[in-house]
Amino acid sequence: MKKLLVFVFILALLGSCSKKGCNDPLAKNYDSSVKKDDGTCLYSILGDWELQTYILNGDDLTTTFSDYIVHLYSDSSYLAEYLMLGDSIYINTRGTFTLNDSHTELSYENTEINYNDGNGWNPAIVTYTYSVNALTYETLNMSLISTDVPNVSSVEVIMSKI
């Protein structure tokens, strides 16, 4: 009888353990059988993102933009459209991006820029690698790891999905 009680107790204990993982249906790695979210949800970076915060070399430059939107496409290309405060003509950049499998590092390679001044797209090769501090369904928060842009030592960016 004691063995049966011990066996039933062990079964009850094991059966009461909740499965951990990602229980957010908006995440790429959603698991409907998960009872307790353990913070491992991975979200798609694809879509349209609007700038919320831009800190360059310690200076908050967010308000220097009237508009700043980045479109990230499924073929790993992107298009950035931004309008400086007081200007009436958008500047566009395009290139490619890579997000690593663990969603901790995002790299951009700018390939072209268009000042929309009648001269069309011009080569502009620039690379940025960011540490992804947070990527949710609605928010992207990242910090610069490296770039080949002279005089840029730090960048903090927060964007919201639109």
Predicted regions located by residue number:
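Primarily marks secretory-pathway-exposed extracellular/lumenal segments that are disulfide-
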Residues: L5-V6, S18-E50, N57, I69, ...
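Bacterial N-terminal signal peptides
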Residues: F7-A12
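C-terminal motif of bacterial Sec signal peptides marking the signal peptidase cleavage site
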Residues: L14-S16
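Contiguous, well-ordered beta-strand patches that form the walls/edges
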Residues: L56-D60, S77-S143
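A short beta-loop-beta micro-motif enriched in histidine and acidic residues
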Residues: F65
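Secondary-structure capping and domain/repeat boundary segments
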Residues: H71-S76
